[in-house]
Amino acid sequence: MIQPQSYLTAADNSGARKLMCIRVLGGGNRRYARIGDVIVAVVKDGIPNIPIKKSDTVKAVIVRTRKELKRDNGMNICFDDNAAVIINADGNPRGTRVFGPVARELRDKNFTKIISLAPEVL
């Protein structure tokens, strides 16, 4: 569960390393975001000489959370870190690679481009 002021790692090669959530999108006053939700984040740490710089405001989709996710078949899935992929206004990732596993629930939310770039889908 991601809420404002939560730190995440960037799971792509867009140039950001650390992100901080500042808003959960979707609904008036949503408190938490889960896998597949879109957030507004600020870049706290980045790679030099890349278009995405520190203190830039970006939209990102959450691909991994430490909080377990209950599936309909009764299985619980959780990851070692909280991670997000930076997206543009169309919902496509700004980077060209995605690092680490991502959850299958992204396919239900129409983030198929992220699914195709990921090395492993759980």
Curated annotation (Swiss-Prot):
It is found in: Plastid, Cyanelle. The keyword Nucleotidyltransferase does not apply. Keywords: Cyanelle, Plastid, Ribonucleoprotein, Ribosomal protein, RNA-binding, rRNA-binding. It comes from the Eukaryota. SUPFAM superfamilies: Ribosomal protein L14. Disulfide bonds: none annotated. Gene3D superfamilies: Ribosomal protein L14 (2.40.150.20). One of its GO terms (biological process) is translation. NCBIfam families: rplN_bact. Binds to 23S rRNA. This is Large ribosomal subunit protein uL14c.
